[in-house]
UniProtKB/Swiss-Prot annotation:
HAMAP family found in the cross-reference section: PEPcase_type1
Gene: ppc
A single GO BP: oxaloacetate metabolic process
Protein's organism: Aliivibrio fischeri (strain ATCC 700601 / ES114) (Vibrio fischeri)
Keywords, ordered alphabetically: Carbon dioxide fixation, Lyase, Magnesium
Name the record gives this protein: Phosphoenolpyruvate carboxylase
Role of this protein: Forms oxaloacetate, a four-carbon dicarboxylic acid source for the tricarboxylic acid cycle.
Length: 876
């Protein structure tokens, strides 16, 4: 094996060895020997030995039921540890240049200088920089909070062991600590026994903030400030807020009946409690640090005649935060809160802390001011009094149901049956009216009451506590106006961003038309104050039309929305609903952002970060700093050095690719009569529905086919059996079609000169590398009826043909040539993922033979699902 990744390899083998010790202690030498045999066979089978592959299959088939779980857990833990070693490697001092992101910000600044971008323009772009990451729960984030805390500690140990001057006894102590942590992880329950509640999911999100972002954001801003100072001669203004966090956990009720208005209220209280708790730790640290006496008159006035003025001010804040925790505790328990002043607004912290900061600078103690105090000030700007801003998300028909029920009660007809024009007239009329619309004696159905109650919870909060109100499956202008009306009726005292989410192919194509219609309404134009947010859906459009077609529809919609908002002088923020997978838009962030249409990042970036991707991108402070550097540099680059406008012939060819790929995709998914039975038999789709993975059901409609499946289980199921079908189906076929029609040279030009197109192909390469046709065939043979085998065979042949077509256009000999680290990292994990796949196929075979699944087999199955998800990385 090449020397390139020696440090990583040695960490992987050390962690593997320690895990082996744990397995031996827990289950004896015999089981460890079995795990080792399977691992070695997997390695040689991967290298091409058919004999060893057959031996591996037999070895797994012969495992007794009671060994399935420990063997599955062994490989699952191997993968978790490999992922951690790899994540650590990207921030370690041994990291190779092509692995560690080179310093993205400095690289960008030298690019800007070479392109003669003025410092004035750069400074302006920095002032406007806005990165908002929206944390969303994710059924496939199988790692529990318990495990996440252990991951952070394991990283600390790896970091210690890397120090050159570590003493022998210190090394010994650290290795023992590592072994303890690995043993703790082994003996903890990896998998949740019950479905997490929306409250559990929110707590998971807060744990990420506490363990990583609380340190990571000020750390990033400190580095960013130094880079700016070096390049522009001026740093980041103290009150700048380039990064902030929002969340859907506890606010996203689309298709999730468990997220009620009560849950939303509770999550918002918890969020404020967590913020106060974290600030209190900061303030206590500052009390111990700021023992200085000299101060300005302003601070003297705030502190009174205390000898240590800074401490006096900080102690007042300590009391404020203590009272806040007490009051929120009482509210969460449903008790009467004590009547004390509590934290409701970030300025209550900012003003006194900023006064201390200015005073220290004025008195010649700038070096002290720029330490922990500056970090706390940056946190106050980034996290506010609420830690994260909560979005509300609801499906469009839930709002029209309210209005239908209401209009029927009022005797003026059925809102749902009206034409779009009549709906708009009614809504605008009511929005402009001074009298309330909801009658006092009206008793709505429970579903309608729930929507009204949610709007009331929104109206009780402060504007700072909330992000936007997202309408999923938005199709028309009336969908947006309806929400504005319901919020107005609930007495909402501020203007909340109401954000339509366009997610199917048709809705994306019509998004411009819908927004034009809204902007032509005088009431609406006046109300939005020239600011509009629109969300682009990635997952449902890909499930509807395949990745190539969906990707082009998303690009075209963004372009059209930028154009219409520019014409109307409206500031547009595009909100991207991209998940971790390729089928759901998950290209590596930097590449994905630079492949968007020109001007689409002018209003900043707002993007959802999901469960398992939160852990990979933001799970450790140093990793989060890297991610923010990439986001910041990509946004600045996109705004200061915009990508080229696509040539007309590129667009024309993209239209063809889109049409051909959509047809090829739908011919299989909708046209093949055997497709649904094949999907159900060859993947763990049915079993996934039973697992306690997320708080929301896997289906919108329990009886429907593929179209009723949520996008996440749809993609997740296919990544489990390694065919990863939704992430490539249709794309390669369309490329081959265009080559056959004589467009090879044009495709090659697009690949060289158009970031949008080259990113698409790069994503396809990564998917192809993760596919394993041989494994998918094994699932077919073990699990599906013989009559379905030809369909699986056709799909695998198509996959091989598609790979050839993409490599042909890129002029590459093999996949991921330009990303050796990415390819190495997939290779490293395959040795552990393959046995898990075989175990899973075996478990599916055994459980499907039984009337009643034994808990033992069910647990083993869940472990394989978690392990394969960890091994495939961007899973769902």
């Amino acid at each position: 094996m090449n020397e390139k990744y020696a440090a990583l390899k040695s960490n992987v083998s050390m962690l593997g060895h320690l895990l082996g010790n744990t397995i031996r202690d827990a289950h004896g030498e015999e089981l460890l020997a079995k795990v080792e045999t399977i691992r070695k066979l997997s390695k040689t089978a991967r290298a091409g030995s058919d004999e060893d592959r057959n031996a591996l299959i037999e070895e797994i088939k012969s495992l007794p039921d009671d060994q399935l779980t420990p063997v599955a857990r062994a490989f699952s833990q191997f993968l978790n540890l490999t992922n951690m070693a790899e994540q650590y490697h990207t921030i370690s001092r041994h990291c190779e240049a092509h692995v560690c992101e080179p310093d993205a910000i400095s690289t960008l600044f030298s690019k800007l200088s070479q392109s003669n971008v003025s410092k004035l323009d750069t400074a302006q772009a920095v002032r406007e920089l806005n990165i908002e990451l929206v944390l969303t729960a994710h059924p496939t984030e199988i790692a529990r909070r318990t495990m996440i805390n252990k991951l952070v500690k394991i990283n600390e140990c790896l970091s210690k062991l890397e120090l050159g001057d570590i003493s022998f006894s210190e090394r010994d102590k650290t290795e023992r600590r590592l072994e303890q942590l690995i043993a703790q992880a082994w003996h903890s329950d990896v998998i949740r026994q019950e479905r997490p509640t929306p409250l559990d999911e929110a707590k998971w999100g807060f744990a990420v903030v506490e363990n990583s972002l609380w340190q990571g954001i000020p750390e990033f801003l400190r580095e960013f400030d130094q880079r700016l100072e070096g390049h522009l001669g001026e740093g980041l203004p103290i009150d700048a807020r380039p990064v902030h966090m929002s969340s859907w956990m506890g606010g996203d009720r689309d298709g999730n009946p468990f997220v009620t208005h009560k849950i939303t209220r509770e999550v918002m209280l918890l969020s404020r409690w967590k913020a106060a708790d974290l600030y209190l730790k900061d303030i206590n640290e500052l009390i111990s640090e700021l023992s200085m006496v000299k101060c300005t008159d302003e601070v003297r006035e705030l502190a009174g005649d205390q000898h240590e003025p800074y401490r006096a001010i900080l102690k007042q804040l300590r009391t404020l935060l203590g009272d806040t925790l007490e009051s929120l505790d009482a509210q969460m328990k449903g008790e009467l809160a004590p009547n004390k002043v509590i934290l409701t607004d970030a300025d209550q912290l900012w003003n006194p802390l900023y006064a201390c900061y200015q005073s220290l600078h004025a008195c010649g103690m700038g070096i002290i001011a720029d330490g922990s105090l500056l970090d706390t000030l940056r946190r106050v700007k980034a996290f506010g009094a609420h830690l994260v801003r909560l979005d509300i998300r609801q499906e469009s028909t839930r709002h029209s149901d309210v209005l239908s029920e209401l209009t029927r009660y009022l005797g003026i007809g059925d809102y749902d049956q009206w034409s779009e024009q009549d709906k708009i007239s009614f809504l605008v009329n009511e929005l402009s009216s001074k009298r309330p619309l909801l009658p006092r004696k009206w008793e709505p159905s429970p579903e309608v009451q729930e929507v009204i109650d949610t709007c009331k919870v929104v109206a009780e909060q402060s504007k700072e506590a909330l992000g936007s109100y997202v309408i999923s499956m938005a199709r028309t202008a009336s969908d947006v106006l309806a929400v504005h009306l319901l919020l107005q009726e609930a007495g909402c005292p501020f203007r909340m961003d109401v954000c339509p989410l366009f997610e199917t192919l048709d809705d994306l194509n019509r998004s411009k038309e819908v927004m034009e219609q809204l902007f032509s309404i005088d009431w609406y134009r006046g109300f939005i104050q020239n600011h509009q947010m629109v969300m682009i859906g990635y997952s449902d459009s890909a499930k509807d039309a395949g990745v190539m077609s969906a990707g082009w529809a998303q690009y075209s919609a963004m372009e059209a929305l930028v154009e219409v908002c520019e014409k109307e002088s409206i500031e547009l923020t595009l909100f991207h609903g991209r998940g971790g997978t390729i089928g759901r838009g998950g290209a590596p962030a930097h590449a994905a952002l630079l492949s968007q249409p020109p001007k689409s990042l002018k209003g900043g970036l707002r993007v959802t970060e999901q469960g398992e991707m939160i852990r990979f991108k933001l799970g450790l402070p140093e990793v989060a700093v890297n991610s923010f550097n990439l986001y910041a540099s990509a946004i600045l680059e996109a705004n200061l050095l915009p990508p080229p406008e696509p040539k007309q012939e590129w667009r024309d060819l993209m239209e063809v690719l889109s049409e051909v790929s959509c047809e090829a995709y739908r011919n299989v998914v909708r046209g093949e009569k055997d497709f649904v039975p094949y999907f159900r038999a060859a993947t763990p789709e049915l079993e996934l529905g039973k697992l306690p993975l997320g708080s929301r059901p896997a289906k919108r409609n329990p009886n429907g086919g593929v179209e009723s499946l949520r996008a996440i289980p749809w993609i997740f199921s296919w990544s489990q059996n390694r065919l990863v079908l939704p992430a490539w189906l249709g794309a390669g076929e369309a490329i081959q079609y265009s080559i056959d029609k004589g467009h090879q040279a044009l495709l090659e030009e697009m690949c060289r000169e158009w970031p949008f197109f080259s990113t698409r192909l790069g994503m396809l390469e990564m998917v192809y590398t993760k596919c394993n046709p041989q494994m998918s065939e094994y699932y077919d043979q073990r699990l599906t009826d013989k009559s379905l085998w030809p369909l699986g065979e056709r799909l695998r042949n198509q996959l091989q043909a598609d790979i050839k077509a993409v490599l042909n256009v890129e002029n590459n000999d093999h996949l991921m040539e330009r990303d050796p680290w990415g390819s190495e990292s997939i290779r490293l994990r395959n040795i552990y993922v393959d046995p898990l796949n075989m175990l899973q196929a075996e478990l599916l075979f055994r459980t499907r033979q039984q009337e009643e699944t034994s808990p033992e087999l069910e647990e083993a199955l869940m472990v394989t699902i978690a392990g394969i998800a960890a091994g495939m990385r961007n899973t769902g």
